[in-house]
Amino acid sequence: MWADAGTAPDRSVLRADYQTAGRGRLDRRWEAPSGASLLASILFLAPPPVPTKLTQAVGRAALDAIEAVAERDLTGRLALKWPNDVLLDGRKVAGVLAQRSVRTAAVVVGLGLNVAWAPDDAASLVDD
C-alpha cells in the first residue's frame, strides 16, 4: 500500500488516468477506461480514529466540487448515499473508499468520479 512506503507527505494526492483492478466496498470491482474518470487517492498520515469520517468528508467535498464546476445546474440532483456514494438523479456518479494501512496509522481515501463514462447502472457528468 502506498501509505506503507513512508515517503509521501501528509495529504499527498496520487492521480490515475484509468483503473483496471480497483475494488470498492465489499470487494466490489471498479474499473474505468482511460480518460473517462477522475481517479485520485489522498494520503492522510494522521487521520481521525474513524476512517468513515474521512470518507464522508471527501464525499461531501466531491459533491460540492461537482456542483461548483458543473456546466449545468445540478441543484437538487446530487446526494450523498451512506456510506460512500455520491448520486446524480439517484444513480452513482462517484464512490469514495477509505483504507487504513496495516503498518502505520495512515489512511488512504480513494475517489472515483464518472466524468465521461459510467457503467450501465451508474451516471456520468458528461453523458447525463
Sequence positions of predicted segments:
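Long, positively charged amphipathic alpha-helical accessory segments at protein N-termini or as interdomain linkers
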Residues: 47-77, 88-128
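N-terminal lobe of the biotin/lipoate ligase/transferase fold
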Residues: 1-75
